[in-house]
Amino acid sequence: MNSRRTFLAASGVTALSAQRAVGANDRVRIGIIGPGARGQEILKEALSIPGVELAMATDIYTARLQEVQAISPGVKTAMDYRRLLDEKDIDAVLIATPQHLHCEHFVASLDAGKHVYQEKTMAFTVDHAKRMRVAFQKHPKQKVQIGHQSCSFGMAKDAAEFVAGDKLGKVTMINANMFRNTPTGKPQWSRPVKPDMNPENVLWKSFLGEAPNRDFDANRYINWRFFWDYSGGNVYENMCHQLSFWYKTMKLQIPQAVTMRGGIYLWKDGREVPDTMNVTMEHPEELLFSWNSGFGNDHLGATEAVLGTHGTVYKDGRGVRLLPQKVNNPSYTEQTGASTAPRNAHMLNFIDAIRKDEAINCPFDVGFRVSIACRMAVDSYRTGKTLRWDAKKEEVTS
């Protein structure tokens, strides 16, 4: 996309210096639902953009509201997110709540007339995805950005150029990895239960949402990523990012069949989600997307390889490269992408969409397709079956 942001990155002009002169009409007042660890990160990205003001923050845990005061002293706060949606002068809402609550907060925010930045994974279930789509279609003038930040990376532009035309020939597979390691005795995602995490300081019923009712459990609250009632595990935390990048770049549809296998091989700490896994997704484009992930070794890191008869596009943390298949393209030479983007490019794109109707980098449709693929993977693992997508009925079958 030949956007203002791409021009700035290519010309070496920073987003900050380019936007210093912000008029009153460019002011964007935001609210945030869920300023936890990730929520505070995206909030800081938003506030780094001139003319963006935090009007209100809401969270079901009192300590989070105290933490947000350190970011924006004096900001209005509440534990009930509906108080935020009642504020008529709030233009946009950042949603960074646990995954099982996304649908509730997304639909309510759009119905309240707000633009929405929705953290990933967009939808927790197929039903949630459909309900969110109804709300999205009902409010076509409101901007929705799904929080797959890699869609705004500089390498997104390079990857789109590398896969365009017939450079890769027939693409039959994408092989992706996401591996991490942590010091012995420090399990991935594990967070300590603090003394103030009690029913007086946490709105437990609001946390549960549509999840099964149960008595207050501070561990389930703070370590919600461990439990299927609230989380899709690593599939929803990391596979979604790698899917979204290529689902957008290559316009891939929802997979017609998904198989996930794995287990809890490392940490027997009460978690329900696996720490080691393999997902195979068969797409209607005659393309197999394979994703391997684990938390016990970081040698393979986070990488993706798009495999075509004429070439390979290889992506890692350093950038993206086009590698020729000499057997079919003996004259081709390796190409390395050089496009860059500011750290807050995804949030900047969202704000520019509100201000100037700029195209959204990760639109709702990408989030929808990714959400369905992720849910199919999780349910395949939990049932031990290969699951299939009926595109006409929009239903998952086995």
Where are these regions (language model features)?
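Contiguous beta-strand/loop segments that form the cofactor/metal-binding neighborhood of enzyme cores
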Residues: 157-158, 170, 175-323, 328-365, ...
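N-terminal secretory signal peptides and thylakoid transit peptides that target proteins
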Residues: 1-12
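Conserved SAM-binding strand-loop segment of SAM-dependent methyltransferases
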Residues: 76-80
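N-terminal Rossmann-like NAD(P) cofactor-binding module of classical short-chain dehydrogenase/reductase
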Residues: 93-94
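Short, conserved SAM-binding/catalytic segment
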Residues: 68-75, 135-137
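Beta-strand-loop-alpha-helix segment that lines the small-molecule cofactor/substrate pocket
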Residues: 98, 103-152, 166, 384
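N-terminal Rossmann-like dinucleotide-binding module
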Residues: 10-72, 150-153, 163, 246
